[in-house]
Swiss-Prot record:
It comes from the Eukaryota. Keywords: Heme, Iron, Metal-binding, Oxygen transport, Transport. This is Hemoglobin subunit alpha-A. Gene3D superfamilies: Globins. InterPro entries: Globin, Globin-like_sf, Globin/Proto, Hemoglobin_a-typ, Hemoglobin_oxygen_transport, Hemoglobin_pi.
Amino acid sequence: MVLTAGDKANVKTVWSKVGSHLEEYGSETLERLFIVYPSTKTYFPHFDLHHDSAQVRAHGRKVLSALGEAVNHIDDIPGALSKLSDLHAQTLRVDPVNFKLLNLCFVVVVGRHHPTILTPEVHVSLDKFLSAVATALTSKYR
């Protein structure tokens, strides 16, 4: 899916709200992921997965920082996330479906905190962007 200029502008608008809340929104996204899709916990056997865990907060910040890199390099998402794709495909061996599940949880978090900006048009743009991120992250699985 190609991101239009309008999609890119919409994603950057969302990120202008999210970017200053990386740890908060990131940990909330992960907590939702673990609750709604409990099988995703298997990738974090060494983490304290309780609410407000320092490990979940730190990893949430990492996850959203990576999304921020994708936003900052929106015209070259695969290039921006290449090393992360290698890590997840070759070392961590994360099932690619989990990126889609994480994306769903992230959209819920954005909508919960910023309901007025998540219009149908912005939602579509964000979905397209997150799909491009998931595609980039799974590109090294072959």
